[in-house]
From Swiss-Prot:
Task of the protein: Catalyzes the phosphorolysis of diverse nucleosides, yielding D-ribose 1-phosphate and the respective free bases. Can use uridine, adenosine, guanosine, cytidine, thymidine, inosine and xanthosine as substrates. Also catalyzes the reverse reactions.
Gene, per the UniProt record: ppnP
One Pfam short name: Ppnp
EC code(s) of this entry: 2.4.2.1, 2.4.2.2
Top enzyme category: transferase
Protein name: Pyrimidine/purine nucleoside phosphorylase
Family: Belongs to the nucleoside phosphorylase PpnP family.
Catalytic activity: a purine D-ribonucleoside + phosphate = a purine nucleobase + alpha-D-ribose 1-phosphate; adenosine + phosphate = alpha-D-ribose 1-phosphate + adenine; cytidine + phosphate = cytosine + alpha-D-ribose 1-phosphate; guanosine + phosphate = alpha-D-ribose 1-phosphate + guanine
Keyword rRNA-binding: no
Organism this protein belongs to: Sulfurimonas denitrificans (strain ATCC 33889 / DSM 1251) (Thiomicrospira denitrificans (strain ATCC 33889 / DSM 1251))
MF terms in GO: guanosine phosphorylase activity; purine-nucleoside phosphorylase activity; thymidine phosphorylase activity; uridine phosphorylase activity
Top-level taxonomic group: Bacteria
UniProt keyword list: Glycosyltransferase, Transferase
C-alpha cells in the first residue's frame, strides 16, 4: 500500500532520542493505527507494548530482535517485533519507515 485514504493524522509528532527519530500517528476508521517516521543515523533501543510490523521504505540498518543476532536490512524490507519486548537498531543511513501496531 503506497497511500492511506480516509484516515486521521495526529498533528503532534512523536519525538525520540533528541529528535533523531520522529513519527506521526495515522488512525484508521477501524481503530487500527500506524506511525510514519524517519530515523537519523545512530544507535537506538525501542520497547514495545503491542506487537509491531516495521516496514522500511528507504535506508539501511542493522537490527537485533529479542533472542536473535544482529542482521543487516536494506530496504525495502520489513520485520516483526513481539509485544512487550525490546529491539536494537543501528541506523546506517536516513531511514523512512511505517510501523503497524498489531492488537
Amino acid at each position: 500500500m503506497t497511500k492511506f485514504e480516509n484516515v486521521t493524522v495526529v498533528k503532534k509528532a512523536n519525538i525520540y532520542d533528541g529528535g533523531k527519530v520522529t513519527s506521526r500517528t495515522v488512525e484508521f476508521a477501524d481503530g487500527t493505527r500506524k506511525t510514519l517516521g524517519i530515523m537519523m543515523p545512530g544507535e537506538y533501543t525501542f520497547n514495545t507494548a503491542e506487537a509491531e510490523i516495521m516496514e522500511m521504505m528507504s535506508g539501511e540498518l542493522d537490527i537485533r530482535l529479542p533472542n536473535e543476532d544482529w542482521k543487516t536490512l536494506n530496504t525495502p524490507e520489513s520485520f516483526n517485533v513481539p509485544a512487550n519486548s525490546s529491539f536494537d537498531l543501528k541506523i546506517r543511513t536516513v531511514t523512512d519507515y511505517c510501523c503497524s501496531y498489531i492488537k
